[in-house]
Amino acid sequence: EPVKKKDLKKATVPL
């Protein structure tokens, strides 16, 4: 599932 932009600010998600 695509990550929400809010989550991207919190922490980086591994590809």
From Swiss-Prot:
Q: Where in the cell is it found?
A: Secreted, Cell wall
Superkingdom of the source?
Eukaryota
Question: Where does the UniProt entry say this protein principally localizes?
Answer: secreted
Q: Can you list the GO cellular component terms from the UniProt entry?
A: extracellular region
Alphabetical UniProt keywords: Cell wall, Secreted
- This chain's protein is named 100 kDa cell wall protein
Q: Which organism is it from?
A: Nicotiana tabacum (Common tobacco)
Q: Recite the lineage of the species.
A: Eukaryota, Viridiplantae, Streptophyta, Embryophyta, Tracheophyta
